[in-house]
């Protein structure tokens, strides 16, 4: 499954700097390349040391990591919900993304002009939130009118949708995002997903700080933490300008040394992608052999047939069973044959819930 994250924020907060940091071929580690698809769209690999270990064991012809698409969306301005500036295109680009990376300026620099005159990341957050909420309110009101009418005419599904839309309307009118509305059951979750509302998308607040605040943050970051504490959001602190400069260094060990000097064990890009996985409830399973070792992305809770379908739809349609080896067992025993002989290869049916790190082989018939 593809994962697309959109970088948003006001002008001059560091969106393009973050994108450039990610876009460096050395932004994460020696073997994590970045492919520029368009000037504002790229695809970067998901860092996973387990895949590297499997490749060392299997020595395959090719190793294929999971990927994340990153979109640098044009800076939002007040009035975007009315189509001002690049508003319409901005909102359309967000709608296509699975998650929002909301960059907030958390550094002082007199040489970098702020559109509102001074640095205030909480205010900046509220500006973006308001524009998205206004657009969502327009969408909700239009769909609520139709769903309400159909529900009163006896359409049970429309009635359920109308009930959820009514709760969204109350939240939006109170200045809250749709993601703040509790969903009552899986059925409502499915309805919510198909509404494609902007403020329902998972969000990570990326606090762009100065070099001295890279490890521990600063007062601006703490203000953001307080403002979003009830949002179920991820927060990432990154000195994007500094990390972009470090990413240009050729030698991997030298880059790591500079990160350590900042008090960091891993680059902000690695932490960003890991945070996006947590935010979206994603996990990884592997296929491993002499021809290929590959990481595959699924949702936490997905069952074996669903995982098979990520590889090919025919695998899901004709699913018979899955052979599963736990990652730690494979690393300890080195081969599928050894795992089978040791009783560490399990045969699982269609109700098996895939675990993070499972190494899987699917049997199917079409």
Where are these regions (language model features)?
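Conserved Switch II/interswitch segment of TRAFAC-class P-loop GTPases
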Residues: 42-47, 74-84, 95-156, 174-184, ...
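Generic signal for short, ordered secondary-structure residues
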Residues: 16, 33, 69, 119, ...
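C-terminal-of-GTPase-core extension/linker across diverse P-loop GTPases
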Residues: 2-8, 13, 19, 146-355, ...
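Short amphipathic alpha-helical segments
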Residues: 30-31, 112-116, 217-219, 249
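Amphipathic alpha-helical transducer elements in NTP-driven molecular machines
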Residues: 34, 48-51, 61-70, 84-98, ...
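Conserved G1/Walker A P-loop phosphate-binding module
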Residues: 1-113, 141, 147
């Amino acid at each position: 499954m593809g994962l697309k994250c959109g970088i948003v924020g006001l002008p001059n907060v560091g969106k393009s700097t973050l994108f450039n940091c990610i876009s460096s071929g050395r932004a994460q580690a020696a073997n994590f390349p970045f492919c520029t698809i368009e000037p504002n769209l790229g695809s970067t690999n998901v860092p996973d040391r387990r895949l590297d270990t499997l490749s060392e064991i299997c020595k395959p012809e090719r190793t294929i990591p999971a990927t994340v698409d990153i979109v640098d969306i044009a800076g939002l301005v007040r009035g975007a919900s009315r189509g001002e500036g690049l508003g319409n295109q901005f909102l359309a680009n967000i709608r296509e993304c699975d998650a929002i990376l909301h960059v907030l300026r958390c550094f002082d620099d007199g040489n970098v002009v702020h559109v509102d005159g001074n640095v205030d990341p909480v205010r900046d957050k509220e500006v973006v939130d308001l524009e998205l909420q206004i657009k969502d309110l327009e969408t909700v009101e239009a769909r609520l009118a139709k769903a309400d009418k159909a529900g009163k005419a006896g359409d049970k599904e429309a009635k359920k949708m109308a009930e959820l839309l009514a709760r969204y309307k109350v939240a939006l009118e109170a200045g809250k995002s749709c993601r703040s509305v509790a969903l009552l059951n899986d059925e409502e979750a499915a309805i919510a997903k198909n509404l494609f509302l902007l403020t329902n998308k998972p969000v990570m607040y990326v606090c762009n700080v100065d070099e001295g605040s890279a490890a521990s943050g600063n007062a601006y970051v703490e203000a953001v933490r307080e403002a979003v504490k009830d949002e179920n959001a991820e927060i990432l602190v990154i000195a994007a300008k500094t990390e972009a400069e470090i990413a240009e260094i050729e030698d991997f060990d030298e880059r790591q040394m500079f990160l350590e000097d900042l008090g960091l064990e891993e680059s902000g890009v690695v932490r960003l992608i890991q945070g996006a996985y947590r935010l979206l409830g994603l996990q990884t399973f592997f296929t491993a052999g002499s021809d290929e070792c590959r990481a595959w992305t699924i949702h936490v809770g997905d069952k074996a047939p669903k995982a098979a379908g990520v590889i090919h739809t025919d695998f899901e349609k004709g699913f018979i069973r899955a052979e599963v080896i736990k990652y730690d067992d494979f690393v300890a025993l080195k081969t599928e044959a050894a795992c089978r002989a040791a009783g560490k290869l399990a045969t699982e049916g269609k109700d098996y819930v895939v675990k993070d790190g499972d190494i899987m082989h699917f049997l199917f018939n079409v």
